[in-house]
Regions:
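Hydrophobic helical h-region of N-terminal Sec-dependent signal peptides
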Residues: 22-28
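Bacterial N-terminal signal peptides that target proteins for export
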Residues: 4-22
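All-alpha RGS (Regulator of G-protein Signaling) helical domain and cognate RGS-like helical scaffolds
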Residues: 2, 35-294
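Extended, charged helical scaffold/adaptor regions
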Residues: 2-3, 26
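C-terminal motif of bacterial Sec signal peptides marking the signal peptidase cleavage site
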Residues: 30-33
């Protein structure tokens, strides 16, 4: 007799497949549970630009508009105004770009002044800041002392020039440099080794124009004095240690506020140094990059 086939010949094999699939599902679920959990907002936070990146991006964008002569002058003027603060923020938030941010902030100030003249907009002339209201700077002692020496030297030269009515020098400008010098040396806490008097023989022999040793270009002597002061101060800041590594600082700050303190200090110094560069440009120092960034 012929053996009859079961009504459901694949039941056992089907059951086995179901069991296998179920086991696979359990394993996958277990592996998923063991994977590293996603931290809410982590990826989003990692994609956010840092203050340095934001400042530099804003600065370069506004600088491009400022330099684009195909745009309306009003748009360029407004972009230049924004670039002044954007570059200053770059100097504060990006220590490696301190020189770039400071010099380009002054360059943007000069552009604002030139375009304001074309637009018949009254704008204040450059004025040297004197560290008024600054109680501390998160910069090492040696760097502050070097800046104090640079201010003292140009202050003496301006005093000599003012006495002889050379260039744009005035006693007020001389006093501002000397006041800044005194403030910086006080903030540094270092021994005061400033010379107070300096050899100005070469300056007196070339009171109108002189060869700028940094570029080899002829420029107004008083403008070169201001520019050299700014260069010395930028070099001093560049050589300064970071807040966490400084062996001696003008004022001790807590670790929780060290970054903010450093940024604020760099911002104040960038603004002060940009005053010197702005004044040099206003007095006729070349404003193109090859001269400024020599």
């Amino acid at each position: 007799m012929q053996t009859r086939s079961p009504l459901f010949p694949s039941v056992s094999s089907t059951s086995r497949r179901v069991c296998v699939l179920a086991c696979i599902g359990v394993l996958v679920a277990s592996l998923t549970a063991c994977s590293a959990p996603r931290i809410a907002g982590r990826a989003e936070a990692e994609q956010q630009p840092s203050p340095c990146e934001r400042a530099y991006a804003d600065a370069t964008a506004n600088a491009d508009i400022m330099a684009d002569r195909s745009r309306h002058i009003v748009m360029r003027y407004l972009a230049a105004q924004e670039a002044v603060s954007d570059w200053a923020n770059t100097a504060a938030y990006c220590p490696a770009r301190f020189a770039d941010g400071t010099l380009r902030s002054a360059q943007a100030r000069h552009a604002v002044r030139l375009m304001a003249s074309r637009l018949a907009i009254d704008i204040a002339q450059p004025t040297l800041s004197r560290c008024d209201g600054i109680d501390s700077l998160d910069v090492d002692t040696d760097s502050l002392a070097a800046m104090a020496a640079a201010e003292d030297q140009v202050g003496f030269a301006m005093e000599v020039f003012a006495a002889r009515s050379f260039g744009h020098a005035t006693l007020d400008i001389s006093d501002r440099h000397k006041t800044t010098s005194q403030r910086l040396i006080s903030l540094s806490g270092a021994e005061d080794n400033r010379a107070k008097t300096y050899d100005v023989t070469q300056l007196l022999a070339n009171p109108n124009t002189i060869v700028d040793s940094a570029t080899g270009l002829y420029a107004p002597t008083d403008a070169v004095l201001e520019m050299n002061c700014a260069r010395s101060e930028i070099a001093a800041v560049a050589a300064s240690s970071t807040s966490s590594n400084a062996s001696t600082k003008s004022q001790t700050t807590s670790d929780d506020h060290s970054d903010d303190s450093r940024e604020q200090s760099l911002g104040m110094l960038a603004s002060m140094i940009a005053d010197r560069v702005d004044l040099a440009l206003d007095w006729g120092y070349p404003a193109f990059d090859e001269a400024l960034f020599a």
